[in-house]
Amino acid sequence: MTITDFFDSLAKQLTAWWNDGAVMAHAGFPNGLGTTEEEVIQALENGLMVIEESNRLIGECNYCSTADGVAKIGIKICESDCQNRGVGRKALSMLIGWLFQNGYSKIVLDTDLTNTRAQHVYESLGFRKVQTNIDSWKDRLGQLQSSVDYELLEKDFISYI
């Protein structure tokens, strides 16, 4: 498995995933994002990477600096046949390890409260729940959604690579 920087040539695949309600439902977009390739390219100039396995794009991950030494991350394993195989845990281990090696001291993320599969993965990597946000935002269907905030310090990181 490899994680590589996002290139404009990958926008078609990323757009397809982001417009797929089955892929995006966990993030509050059950009908997808309704975005174009051009919008994807414009919105994602920094911090977006794609996950490949056996020369096949299977997902994406991203990070951005939110404060001095703090990176916020996200991940999606978009191909359903690649889910529940430890691919996300391995990809996160690669990304988090790289972030810690490059000077970040804390990693933060959030996930939907109902996404217990992701919560299990995050906690297995050493993430600690910081806060639960009940009915804190509305999805595209107008339904209130809840989320969980997590953080990880380097000393607590459990790598799976």
Regions found by a protein language model. Give the residues of each.
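Active-site acidic-Proline motif in GNAT/NAT acetyltransferases
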Residues: 79-85, 113-114
